[in-house]
């Protein structure tokens, strides 16, 4: 083990089966963590900090301190905060994908899928009187990042489009089942759904009375989609799980 400037540097210990990072958790207590575990902890920590604060306010030192790793360990895995952010976007998608697959499962009717989406948004993205939920970390970050950081912007565009694809599929299902007033362009309407939901999520932070948001989000989606009035709230959500990120 080497020591520089009073701080123990990360050391790679190579075995026949696994590489490990060795770093201090406290001054006299040390632990071993595999390279894979270290990487995953950095991704999860970055996601948590960006969600609680914002992209510009969270630095490499903050991430390392919260994750309990050295900067040497950080830069072994990521070239910069921007590269970590891009991979955290992919990590975030892997975390919530199972939730969305369940919300939009074809086992549910199109109207149930719409109600499931509303339920998912309320549980995972909207504040409650007893729990502050800062919305979507990556949508919020997109509003804070300069236009010159193309790598980060491309990661955000890719993540957004992946989510929009679920909305597009829902529009097509509603249309095919005859629930909509008029024929529409699914791609355009799916994108509008995504934008509307995130606008409501942002506005909810200014609302001390969440009951207004609970009324506006469902009704706004039914209006935006052009669902025939006789089908409004005709079915209830069939997805009752807790979102993965809130567990």
Where are these regions (language model features)?
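Short, basic, alpha-helical segments at the C-terminal edge of helix-turn-helix-like DNA-binding modules
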Residues: 90-95
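Hydrophobic alpha-helical connector segments
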Residues: 87, 101-134, 186-193
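Helix-turn-helix
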Residues: 38-41, 49-83, 87
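N-terminal intrinsically disordered/low-complexity leader segments
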Residues: 1-37, 230-247
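Amphipathic alpha-helical segments used for helix-helix packing
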Residues: 113, 128-151
């Amino acid at each position: 083990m080497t020591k520089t400037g009073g701080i123990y540097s990360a050391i790679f210990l190579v075995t026949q089966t696994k590489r490990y990072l060795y770093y201090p958790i406290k001054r006299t207590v040390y632990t071993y963590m595999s390279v894979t575990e270290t990487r995953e902890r950095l991704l999860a920590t970055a996601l948590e900090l960006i969600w609680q604060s914002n992209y510009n306010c969270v630095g490499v030192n903050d991430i390392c301190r919260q994750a309990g790793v050295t900067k040497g360990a950080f830069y072994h895995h990521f070239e910069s905060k921007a590269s970590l952010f891009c991979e955290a976007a992919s990590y975030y998608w892997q975390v919530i994908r199972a939730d969305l697959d369940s919300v939009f499962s074809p086992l549910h009717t199109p109207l149930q899928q719409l109600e499931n989406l509303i339920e998912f948004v309320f549980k995972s993205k909207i504040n409650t009187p007893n729990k502050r939920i800062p919305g979507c970390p990556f949508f919020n970050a997109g509003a804070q990042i300069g236009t010159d950081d193309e790598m980060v912007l491309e990661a955000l565009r890719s993540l957004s489009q992946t989510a929009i694809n679920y909305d597009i599929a829902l529009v097509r299902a509603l249309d095919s089942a005859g629930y909509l007033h008029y024929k529409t362009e699914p791609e355009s309407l799916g994108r509008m759904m995504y934008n509307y939901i995130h606008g409501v999520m942002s506005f909810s932070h200014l609302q001390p009375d969440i009951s207004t948001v609970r009324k506006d989000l469902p009704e706004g989606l039914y209006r935006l989609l052009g669902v025939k009035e006789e089908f409004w709230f005709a079915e209830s959500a069939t997805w009752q799980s807790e979102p993965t990120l809130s567990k």
